[in-house]
Design a protein with these regions (language model features):
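Membrane-embedded beta-strand positions in outer-membrane beta-barrel channels/transporters
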Residues: 32, 45, 88-90, 142-146, ...
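Cleavable N-terminal export/targeting peptides
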Residues: 1-25
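Extracytoplasmic electrostatic interaction patches
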Residues: 162-173, 178
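Gram-negative (and chloroplast) outer-membrane scaffold detector with strong preference
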Residues: 50-146, 151-157, 161
Length: 190
């Protein structure tokens, strides 16, 4: 009788876990907000993800930055570029079987841009050479990859940690060499 009772309890716990997994899998859309980027670099980062298969999803992440510290460093000559925006379409593959807590791998593209500054040598009408600072804008495209971990609370609230890097490909003399995707995201799945 004890064995039958233990077997019944194990089966009921398993069926409850399956119900939670199915409830999460039935929700196909998710919005997220990056808390870490806002705190550390005054960057607003929003993401939308659409779950299109059992272990596969696609999405878009947008970042807008207006960090006073980065702008001050840029104006004082400590850096020659400052990123202002990013649009990152991505595709993700879940690496774990669970739908409520899982690791994932991501491939992303990044259309990014910002301000660029360089010191150039000019010659005036009297053939006198002088140096000046020239500010301009840059845009670039990067490809990269990320790894992350996501968990759900109450089948709707998402907590995600992601770390990834990409390399700018087209305008490398003005844009940063590396694009990073590091974040601690809070989201809502519906």
């Amino acid at each position: 009788m004890k064995k039958l009772l233990i077997l019944f309890l194990l089966f009921s716990f398993y069926s409850q876990a399956q119900e939670k997994e199915n409830a999460i899998a039935a929700k196909k859309n998710e919005f997220r907000f990056d808390v870490l980027s806002l705190i550390t670099s005054s960057k607003i980062s929003l993401s939308y993800e659409r779950f299109v298969g059992k272990d596969f999803s696609v999405g878009l992440n947008t970042n807008f930055s207006s960090s006073n510290k980065l702008n001050k460093d840029f104006d004082n000559g400590y850096r020659n570029n400052v990123p202002k925006f990013e649009f990152n379409p991505y595709a993700r593959l879940a690496l774990s079987k669970s739908k409520s807590r899982y690791y994932f791998a991501e491939l992303f593209g990044s259309y990014n841009g910002g301000d660029f500054k360089e010191i150039i040598r000019l010659v005036d009408n009297n053939n006198v050479a002088y140096y000046t600072t020239l500010k301009s804008k840059y845009t670039d495209f990067a490809l990269g990859g990320s790894l992350g971990y996501k968990m759900y609370f109450n089948q709707k609230i998402a907590l995600e940690f992601i770390v990834g890097f990409g390399k700018n490909l087209t305008n490398r003399e003005k844009s940063p060499d590396v694009i990073s995707r590091v974040g601690l995201n809070l989201g809502y799945r519906f």
